[in-house]
């Protein structure tokens, strides 16, 4: 994260973190200018991000009790490992994928197992299942995947969940979910109603352009949500971050503009 620098070079363009070049919504900028970053700085943030969870539940038609707020989706990914893994367990993830997955494995003392990919750098149900052992506790699947841009269809995800032992947690990392415009793609929220071992993660860092404020969240069954809350710190997201995230959610016109622009650029 942050700015990149190369000795002797100026104005380096940093691409490695996939930051939103549009920046945040104009409404977010206006709110920040009006209130300033020290708005209510003497007050602790809400422990559970109640207002943000309620806004997320309304927009996505979800149960707010099953939403857990994190310091970026990175933290919610870590929550899963802290809650369900220990030394000697195995975590499965793609060979070419988000670098947080092997970092998280090291944090909890687990072993990373890499999913074999095809010639297009895509994983499939069979290649995932081939890595499963009695020691497997979590499978992290960025869907769509970072950095390859490949994705698993709703049918593939369902086939995988049906074939897996029910004690294995499948974390569907939807950091780039809003960008996908495909009929066979599903962001995964509906899967929570069908399978008890699914966690869906989302972030405000990408399409919403709020990477510096570190806000993310996850959605799961009530049982899993209660377990995740046990490993979450009480004040893990800033007050201003929660409030600005709500403003960003309300600016649908800007969100659609960013998505449309990304879609058009892909056709170049």
Model-derived segments and spans:
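PLP-dependent aminotransferase-like
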Residues: 83-141
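Active-site pre-lysine segment of PLP-dependent enzymes
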Residues: 123-134, 147-170, 174-207
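Phosphate-binding glycine-rich loop
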Residues: 50-90
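N-terminal "arm"/small-domain region of PLP-dependent enzymes with the aminotransferase-like
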Residues: 1-43
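Short glycine-rich anion-binding loops that position phosphate/pyrophosphate groups of nucleotides
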Residues: 18-21, 73-74, 98, 143-147, ...
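Structural scaffold positions in well-ordered secondary structure
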Residues: 15, 139, 173-175, 201, ...
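PLP-dependent aminotransferase class I/II
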Residues: 25, 197-268
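Short, structured coil segments at secondary-structure junctions
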Residues: 63, 108-109, 194-195
């Amino acid at each position: 994260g942050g700015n990149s620098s190369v000795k002797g070079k100026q104005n380096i363009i940093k691409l490695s973190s996939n930051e939103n070049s549009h920046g945040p919504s104009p409404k977010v900028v206006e709110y920040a200018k009006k209130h300033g970053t020290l708005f209510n700085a003497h007050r602790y943030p809400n422990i559970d991000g109640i207002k943000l969870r309620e806004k997320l539940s309304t927009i996505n038609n979800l149960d707010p009790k099953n939403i857990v707020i994190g310091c970026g989706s990175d933290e919610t990914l870590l929550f899963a490992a802290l809650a369900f893994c220990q030394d000697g367990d195995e975590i499965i993830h793609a060979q070419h994928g988000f670098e947080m997955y092997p970092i998280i494995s090291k944090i909890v003392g687990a072993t990373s197992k890499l999913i074999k990919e095809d010639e297009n750098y895509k994983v499939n149900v069979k290649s995932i299942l081939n890595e499963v052992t009695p020691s497997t506790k979590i499978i992290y699947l960025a869907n769509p995947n970072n950095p390859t841009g490949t994705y698993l269809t709703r049918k593939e995800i369902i086939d995988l969940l049906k074939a897996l032992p029910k004690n294995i947690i499948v974390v569907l990392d939807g950091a780039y979910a809003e960008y996908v415009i495909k009929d066979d793609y599903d962001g995964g929220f509906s899967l929570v109603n069908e399978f008890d071992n699914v966690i869906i993660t989302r972030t405000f860092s990408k399409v919403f352009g709020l990477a510096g404020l570190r806000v993310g969240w996850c959605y799961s069954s009530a049982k899993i949500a209660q377990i995740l809350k046990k490993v979450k710190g009480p004040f893990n997201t800033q007050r201003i971050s929660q409030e600005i995230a709500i403003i960003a959610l309300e600016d649908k016109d800007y969100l659609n503009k960013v998505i449309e622009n990304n879609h058009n650029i892909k056709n170049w």
